[in-house]
Amino acid sequence: MEKPWWSTRFFKKYFLMKISVELFGAAREFSTKSHLDFELIENSSIKDLRNQMIDFVDLNFKGNETFKKIIKSSAFCSSDDKIVSDNYKIVKKQNFSIIPPIGGG
C-alpha cells in the first residue's frame, strides 16, 4: 500500500514545522521531559497546536479529561515571552510554553 502524500519526506521537509512546547505547572504531568514536540503544517494556529496536544492526551493518557481541561484553559506563550491567542499563526519553527491557570483560593 502506498504511503499517504503527507507522510513523504518531501512534504515533511517543506511543509511541516517542528514545534516544541515547554511544560509548566500541571502540564508537566504530560511528559517525563520538560517539553513536548509536535509537527504542524505551515501557517497553523495556536488552536491547531492546542488540538494536537489534546490528541496527544487522547492517545497517551486514554483521554484524561483533567489533562484536556488543562490544555483548553491554558495560555500559550511565545519564545519572546508574549501571550499568544488561539488565532496566532505559526509561520516558522517556533518554541512555545503552555501556562496552565494557577489554582488556589
Predicted regions and their residues:
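Ubiquitin-like/PB1-type beta-grasp interaction modules and other compact soluble beta-rich domains
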Residues: 2-104
